[in-house]
């Protein structure tokens, strides 16, 4: 999709550039594949704010997406490409040979009318965009997206617009993936993945142009902790552009977590054992 800029008839229009959304269906989503999406305002069941900067925005329906791709060896036809307000990528509405309809993430290059399928066996001519296979059947150096972390639990990584992983190698029951961050990670070779990269790669090149468009998306303003009062934030108070006292020498989060130069990932996290090289090029502790 191309980026569309506007004539500067208003101050907001001068700075706005948006996706054209060419080729997307203008029909309403499939009713059987949607659910209500109630607003929370970032509050939990006790009414306390647990996630800041959430509130308002346009009403949205949640689209039920097939992340498992568990209908095997049955061809499906892409009926339409649709916009999804709940994520950065677009969706593809596919119709299987038995008439069942599903939403999947729309890969880059997938066209209306294309034939796709998922299978546990593959030949040389089957590695087309949108087809889904276990990692051990996919050739090395292939770009994939919507990859499972645990077999059968559905895709968990590489689901945002424009993202994709590189399948580096498959050795035994483990596959090595290169993440968009540069991290090298091991996953079970039985995990499923979809060929290609997620579409709508120009999403990051958009400029919303005005605060109101961000509010339409349900995002409220962000206030820096340094300009708050001491009662509202650990970095609040002080004279001018400086944080207050209280014995702190470093910037912290609203809950006191060090914000600069401090690794926030837990060392006890189980998936640490599956990381070969971190995104910064360093190997995990204890690995040579």
Curated annotation (Swiss-Prot):
The keyword Ribonucleoprotein applies. GO terms for cellular component: large ribosomal subunit. Keywords: Ribonucleoprotein, Ribosomal protein, RNA-binding, rRNA-binding. Residues 235-248 have a biased composition (Gly residues). GO terms for biological process: cytoplasmic translation. One of the primary rRNA binding proteins. Required for association of the 30S and 50S subunits to form the 70S ribosome, for tRNA binding and peptide bond formation. It has been suggested to have peptidyltransferase activity; this is somewhat controversial. Makes several contacts with the 16S rRNA in the 70S ribosome. Residues 279-288 have a biased composition (Basic residues). This is Large ribosomal subunit protein uL2. Part of the 50S ribosomal subunit. Forms a bridge to the 30S subunit in the 70S ribosome. Pfam families: Ribosomal_L2, Ribosomal_L2_C. InterPro entries: NA-bd_OB-fold, Rib_uL2_dom2, Ribosomal_uL2, Ribosomal_uL2_bac/org-type, Ribosomal_uL2_C, Ribosomal_uL2_dom3, Ribosomal_uL2_RNA-bd_dom, Translation_prot_SH3-like_sf. Coiled coil: none annotated. It comes from Opitutus terrae (strain DSM 11246 / JCM 15787 / PB90-1). Residues 1-46, 226-288 are annotated as: Disordered. GO terms for molecular function: rRNA binding; structural constituent of ribosome; transferase activity. It comes from the Bacteria. Belongs to the universal ribosomal protein uL2 family.
């Amino acid at each position: 999709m191309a980026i569309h800029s506007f004539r500067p008839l208003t101050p907001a229009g001068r700075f706005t550039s948006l996706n054209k959304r060419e080729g997307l269906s203008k029909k309403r989503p499939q009713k059987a594949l949607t659910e209500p999406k109630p607003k929370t305002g970032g509050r939990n069941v006790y009414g306390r704010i647990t996630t800041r900067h959430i509130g308002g925005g346009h009403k949205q329906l949640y689209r039920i997406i097939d992340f498992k791709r568990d209908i095997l060896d049955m061809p499906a036809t892409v009926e339409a490409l649709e916009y999804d307000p709940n994520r950065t990528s677009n969706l593809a509405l596919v119709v299987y040979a038995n008439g069942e309809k599903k939403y999947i993430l729309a890969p880059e290059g997938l066209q209306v009318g294309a034939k796709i399928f998922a299978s546990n066996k593959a030949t040389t001519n089957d590695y087309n965009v949108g087809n889904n296979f276990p990692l051990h059947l996919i050739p090395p150096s292939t770009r994939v997206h919507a990859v499972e972390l645990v077999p059968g639990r559905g895709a968990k990584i590489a689901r945002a617009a424009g993202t994709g992983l590189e399948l580096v190698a498959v050795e035994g029951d483990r596959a090595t993936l290169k993440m968009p961050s540069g991290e090298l990670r091991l996953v079970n070779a039985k995990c499923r993945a979809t060929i290609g990269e997620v579409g709508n790669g120009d999403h990051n090149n958009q400029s919303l142009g005005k605060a109101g468009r961000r509010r339409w998306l349900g995002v409220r303003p962000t206030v820096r902790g340094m300009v708050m009062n001491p009662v509202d934030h650990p970095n609040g108070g002080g004279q001018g552009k400086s944080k207050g006292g209280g014995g702190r020498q470093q910037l912290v989060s609203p809950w006191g977590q060090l914000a600069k130069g401090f690794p926030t990932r837990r060392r006890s996290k189980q998936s640490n054992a599956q990381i070969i090289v971190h995104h910064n090029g360093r190997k995990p502790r204890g690995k040579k």
